């Protein structure tokens, strides 16, 4: 079997989820970067939704980061999922919640007007408070052991931290979420999952847009 090929966009958080998993599993892989604003035909031919990540394993194409990560986990032991089926399903459910949080956060920093910005900010606060209630003593979602659900949240926390350092939103008091975020950002696979100039690329991506959200972070 040849090295798996991960088809990527440089600042995509869903790609980053899979890169973190590949690094945690110590799987050798290759990366092919595309421009999602002008995707090549060969990519559209293999990606049903026209989205990244896509993982090519020999002649088989996988898409959707959660599916890719579960495949990688199954074929590269030891597992990064709980043994108990109910706990494993619980992790999957909160991975989906993390996806919605990413979309909420994206909607915040791309908001066209102040009202939308404030609505997204309120949604983000409420959802972080909800997430707080799911966390135990840490340092990770399942306690001492890093899991796929942690890989799913790390890209969100990295982006939130970058923007909080640039201009704080005054997020709600969520000490467990904060501690979890700090533990994930300190894990070697997380900074290694993006380029050295990721912060600049991410901020350039935001501030190149028009609207209240980009203006907030240009200030």
Region annotations inferred by a language model:
Residues 19, 181-182:
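Short glycine-/small-residue-rich flexible loop motifs, especially phosphate/cofactor-binding loops
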Residues 179-180, 219:
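Charged, glycine-enriched surface loops/patches
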């Amino acid at each position: 079997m040849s090295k798996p090929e991960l088809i990527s966009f440089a600042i995509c958080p869903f790609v980053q989820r899979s890169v973190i998993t590949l690094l945690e599993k110590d799987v050798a892989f290759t990366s092919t970067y595309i421009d999602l604003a002008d995707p090549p035909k060969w990519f559209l031919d293999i990606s049903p939704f026209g989205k990244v990540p896509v993982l090519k394993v020999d002649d088989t194409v996988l898409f959707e980061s959660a599916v890719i990560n579960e495949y990688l986990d199954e074929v590269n032991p030891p597992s990064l999922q709980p043994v108990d089926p109910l706990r494993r399903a619980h992790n999957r459910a909160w991975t989906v919640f993390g996806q919605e949080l990413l979309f909420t956060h994206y909607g915040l920093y791309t908001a066209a007007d102040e009202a939308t910005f404030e609505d997204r900010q309120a949604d983000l606060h409420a959802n972080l408070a909800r997430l707080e209630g799911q966390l135990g003593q840490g340092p990770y979602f399942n306690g001492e052991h890093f899991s796929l659900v942690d890989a799913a949240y790390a890209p969100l926390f990295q982006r939130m931290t970058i923007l909080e350092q640039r201009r704080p939103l005054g997020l709600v008091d969520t000490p467990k979420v904060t501690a979890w975020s700090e533990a994930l950002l300190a894990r070697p696979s997380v900074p290694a999952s993006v380029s050295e100039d990721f912060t600049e690329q991410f901020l350039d991506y935001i501030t190149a847009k028009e609207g209240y959200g980009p203006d907030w972070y240009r200030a």
